[in-house]
A protein has these predicted regions:
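Short coil/turn connectors at secondary-structure junctions
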Residues: 1-3, 29, 60-61, 89-90, ...
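Glycine-rich phosphate/diphosphate-binding loop of Rossmann-like nucleotide-binding domains
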Residues: 5-26, 131-214, 226
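Buried hydrophobic positions in well-ordered alpha/beta secondary-structure cores of metabolic enzymes
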Residues: 10-13, 62, 115, 153, ...
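N-terminal beta-loop-helix "entrance" segment that forms/cooperates
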Residues: 30-53, 220
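Glycine-rich phosphate/nucleotide-binding loop
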Residues: 40-44, 219-281
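Short, small-residue-enriched loops and turns at beta-alpha junctions
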Residues: 42-44, 72-73, 172-176, 218-219
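N-terminal glycine-rich phosphate/adenylate-binding segment common to multiple enzyme folds
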Residues: 44-136, 235
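Short, acidic/small-residue loops that bind anionic groups at enzyme active sites
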Residues: 85-99, 207-209, 253-269
Length: 281
């Protein structure tokens, strides 16, 4: 018997987590669900959308699955997703993107994974208001976090039988921050035995390459079947993983895993969609 923390979430969260439980039950795996509430439903009572008892439950059970939780735009409380990743040190966001039989999409043979560094970059939340005339956000990229996420991506690639590891960056413009990420990408992929191809060498083995983020966006639309595992800083991963979801039918069919050394939280990628909650859609 496995014990897993279940966070239903806001909006359609109650419906999608109920459906998820039925699917899991159909597999025959014995799971005891420990349900805890987070999000808008507890904000007034606890003064936070993420009460301590939620974190305590996840730390006890080591694994959680959650429905979507509403995040206010431009005001209000900070994202619960971001807080969970920070508090539990869930450094890797993993989003497999595959075409599914029976689901209409523009492509038939996509099988790739976006691996996103989860703890820093512009999503570290280091922001400052400068009077009424400016706002400042700090882009934080560290060697340790970059090393950790690229190492994770290398192991993921090998464990899942993929060949191509692609580092995504904007080092042509952000030469210090993204430049550091790219240097670490080369060091760590080489350390894991994943080398760049020599000129003219056929890609018949595992290999590494890199692509600037805007070129990655274009090529993911033009030739998504050519990619396997892409690893990148936080912001790029957030944007490109949603783009990839659009290639195979939308956010509603894409899973997401947030993984750390000690804990893992699995979730739906889509939002809470309060406008359709309770309609059985």
């Amino acid at each position: 018997m496995y014990k897993i923390t279940l966070i239903p979430g806001d909006g359609i969260g109650l419906e999608v987590t109920a459906a998820m439980k039925k699917v899991v039950e159909a597999t025959g795996v014995a799971i005891e669900w420990e349900e805890v509430i987070a999000g808008e439903a507890v904000l007034e009572e606890y003064g936070s959308p993420l009460p301590d008892y939620v974190l305590d439950s996840i730390k006890k059970n080591k694994i959680a699955i959650k429905g979507p939780i509403t995040t206010p735009v431009g005001k209000g409380f900070r994202s619960v997703n971001v807080a969970l990743r920070k508090e539990l040190k869930l450094f890797a966001n993993v989003r497999p993107v595959k075409t599914f039989k029976g689901i209409k999409s523009r492509y038939e043979d996509i099988d790739l994974t976006i691996i996103r560094e989860n703890t820093e970059d512009l999503y570290a939340g280091i922001e400052h208001q400068i009077g009424d005339y400016a706002g400042e956000s700090i882009k934080l990229i560290t060697r340790d976090a970059s090393d950790r996420i690229v190492d994770f991506a290398c192991k993921y690639l090998k464990d899942n039988g993929y060949k191509r590891l692609t580092g995504v960056h904007k080092a042509n413009i952000m030469k210090i921050s993204d430049g550091l990420f790219l240097r670490v990408f080369d060091e760590v992929s080489s350390r894991n035995g994943i080398e760049r191809l020599e000129k003219g060498e056929a890609p018949d083995k595992v290999y590494a390459d890199d692509v600037i983020v805007d070129a990655a966006a274009m090529n993911l639309v033009l030739n998504p079947e050519k990619f396997d595992v892409l690893v990148m800083p936080n912001l790029y991963g957030d944007i490109l993983s949603d783009l990839c979801a659009g290639l195979v039918g939308g956010l509603g069919i894409i899973p997401s895993a947030n993984i750390g050394e000690d804990y893992a939280v699995f979730e739906a990628v889509h939002g809470s969609a309060p406008q359709i909650a309770g309609q059985g859609i």
